[in-house]
């Protein structure tokens, strides 16, 4: 079964040194409305545009999405 973006994002939780990736992961974990079962860029991107937790969240998401897609292609 294919890993969702949310599952991929959760690998960034719990870092001792916080960065934008871990901040987005912590926010998604605590946000009950985050589209946890989505693998669609547009759905998650639109959600973040309306509910952005910090100013660079959409840029962080784009970077993480590229990594997510790259890892999916590798498997």
Curated annotation (Swiss-Prot):
It holds the Pfam family YozE_SAM_like. Gene3D superfamilies: YozE SAM-like. InterPro entries: UPF0346, YozE_SAM-like, YozE_SAM-like_sf. Transmembrane segments: none annotated. HAMAP family: UPF0346. Belongs to the UPF0346 family. This is UPF0346 protein OB1736.
């Amino acid at each position: 079964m294919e890993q969702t973006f949310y599952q991929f994002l959760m690998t960034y939780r719990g870092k001792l040194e916080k960065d934008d990736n871990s901040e987005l992961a912590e926010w998604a974990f605590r946000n009950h409305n985050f589209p946890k079962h989505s693998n669609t860029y547009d759905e998650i991107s639109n959600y973040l545009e309306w509910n952005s937790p910090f100013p660079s969240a959409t840029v962080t998401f784009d970077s993480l999405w590229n990594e997510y897609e790259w890892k999916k292609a590798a498997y």
